[in-house]
């Protein structure tokens, strides 16, 4: 536990390496607070839809947003639950984005393949009895749109984002299956 705070500080400061440094933070919020439990509705024990996300403080230089949701507490290492890109720089990502490669409504975005092997959002679903998991809802603000096909991988997305991140923010939600 005593190593967690320095690690988080290092990770946030280290984000400058992806974007060339100097990017500002955006505030990300939802129906749950930072370090609070995610309502079951947004998990495999509910209807498994993405929660709404509110993003405050987006730069006027923003061309698009990227969302990456992952669980670093997964038994086999960090598990990716959702990747989406080419989202217009809007302040609200609505709940229940369709699980398809290219989405036009309720908001435009392109989605990639998560670690369940599916396109779109699949919510928290930690192994029963594995304890509390931390789900990181990361929002990257880019100075460009990305030329990636629907269904691309997280690795392809991260490579395409290099040098284009101008802002970053995240919200951490908790979930446990007993």
Curated annotation (Swiss-Prot):
<dbReference type="Pfam" id="PF01161">
    <property type="entry name" value="PBP"/>
</dbReference>
<protein>
    <recommendedName>
        <fullName>UPF0098 protein PYRAB11530</fullName>
    </recommendedName>
</protein>
<feature type="signal peptide">
    <location>
        <begin position="1"/>
        <end position="22"/>
    </location>
</feature>
<dbReference type="InterPro" id="IPR008914">
    <property type="entry name" value="PEBP"/>
</dbReference>
<dbReference type="InterPro" id="IPR036610">
    <property type="entry name" value="PEBP-like_sf"/>
</dbReference>
<comment type="similarity">
    <text>Belongs to the UPF0098 family.</text>
</comment>
<keyword id="KW-0732">Signal</keyword>
<dbReference type="InterPro" id="IPR005247">
    <property type="entry name" value="YbhB_YbcL/LppC-like"/>
</dbReference>
